[in-house]
Amino acid sequence: MFSKSVTLAQYDPDLAAAIAQEDRRQQDHVELIASENYVSCAVMEAQGSQLTNKYAEGYPAKRYYGGCEYVDIVEQLAIDRVKELFGAAYANVQPHSGSQANQAVYASVLKPGDTILGMSLAHGGHLTHGASVNISGKLYNAVTYGLDENEVLDYAEVERLALEHKPKMIVAGASAYALQIDWAKFREIADKVGAYLFVDMAHYAGLVAGGEYPNPVPFCDFVTTTTHKTLRGPRGGVILCRDNTHEKALNSSIFPSLQGGPLMHVIAAKAVAFKEALQPEFKQYAKQVKINAAVMAEELVKRGLRIVSGRTESHVFLVDLQPMKITGKAAEAALGKAHITVNKNAIPNDPEKPFVTSGIRIGSAAMTTRGFNETDARVLSNLVADVLANPEDEANLAKVCGQVTALCDKYPVYGN
């Protein structure tokens, strides 16, 4: 029998200490990694619930196990809420990750060797959009498009490649592209060659939910997203469709093809996050995310830094560090010493290796969750610039760290 009175700290002090240290780090550091965010206490409560004990292979009302009457309610709540959130007719909330959601979409209508057309990883795409090191680039014949000379998504190239290669599926979406993507244009190109259109909106989903980024669902055959990042939920994935045409194929692609039992505690946490995203205050959050990102990009430009694509129209942007003669790896380390967390990131046509890079990626989702406004964003961007101007000056880093600490103390992640 398990006792509710025994705490993690009592049973496993080493693990509890590591968790406490991470909690402290999240409080004391400003999080600017674009794919990270903070979830609510309600989301964490759901994910830490007894639902983790329940196996539920199958789908609501069609399970292979008994005792699923209550987890059926949980999953149906998640399905109904995410459909309402994005105006979808179909939703599968079981994918354990965005990558598995993407695999399921491919598997539902493609055969090995079929051609897909996706955004180049080197220009801001994602591994799962056909990168050679990913299963999507091994199973399928992947052709890639990129950015034009102005670092804007090259729709003319997309159309030219589509007409030349006749892909069975066109993949849109990105992991490091700051501007808005024209879903209608992608639909037009896909229709010209009879291709399926699949959008991975993992990075932009929270902005879409908040009305601050175009919704791809009406234009696409398939849409996937992660449930974390800007959507501010637990780590996981979702598949959405504008109609039910592919329901049977998608459901069987997830179970039994790619996964076994769904993670019911995570699905419960997804349901909570979807409810939060349906509230009016989430729209204000999404609006502030965009404002903060734009302010930071503008301020960094004023300080002499080069922003890839020149600006941002979302939550994310890339900083090209080549003019400053500093690598992304070195910048990430220096900013980390000042308690500013970013990730090194390749820029278009980057001459450096992926573990070094010539850029950093900055995102505003997590800082906005804490309560940072545009004034704070302006201050923070100048602190970033201060570090990048003198990345090896320990006194400078200590000074910036003190200012970051003051900002963090002003906006505790979870309050007292």
Swiss-Prot record:
Pathways per UniProt: One-carbon metabolism; tetrahydrofolate interconversion; Amino-acid biosynthesis; glycine biosynthesis; glycine from L-serine: step 1/1
Q: For (6S)-5,6,7,8-tetrahydrofolate, which residues are the binding ones?
A: 121, 125-127
The protein here is known as Serine hydroxymethyltransferase
Q: What is the lineage of its organism?
A: Bacteria, Pseudomonadati, Pseudomonadota, Betaproteobacteria, Neisseriales
Q: Which GO terms describe its biological process?
A: glycine biosynthetic process from serine; tetrahydrofolate interconversion
How would you summarize the oligomeric state and partners of this protein? Homodimer.
**Where does the UniProt annotation locate this protein?**
Cytoplasm
The record's comment on protein family reads: Belongs to the SHMT family.
Question: Transmembrane stretches, by residue range?
Answer: none
Q: Per UniProt, which keywords does this protein have?
A: Amino-acid biosynthesis, Cytoplasm, One-carbon metabolism, Pyridoxal phosphate, Transferase
Q: Does the keyword Transferase apply?
A: yes
Q: What class of enzyme is it?
A: transferase
Task: Determine if Cell membrane is one of this entry's keywords.
Answer: no
Q: What is its EC number?
A: 2.1.2.1
> Per its UniProt record, what PROSITE patterns does this chain match?
SHMT
Cofactor dependency: pyridoxal 5'-phosphate
Q: What does this protein do?
A: Catalyzes the reversible interconversion of serine and glycine with tetrahydrofolate (THF) serving as the one-carbon carrier. This reaction serves as the major source of one-carbon groups required for the biosynthesis of purines, thymidylate, methionine, and other important biomolecules. Also exhibits THF-independent aldolase activity toward beta-hydroxyamino acids, producing glycine and aldehydes, via a retro-aldol mechanism.
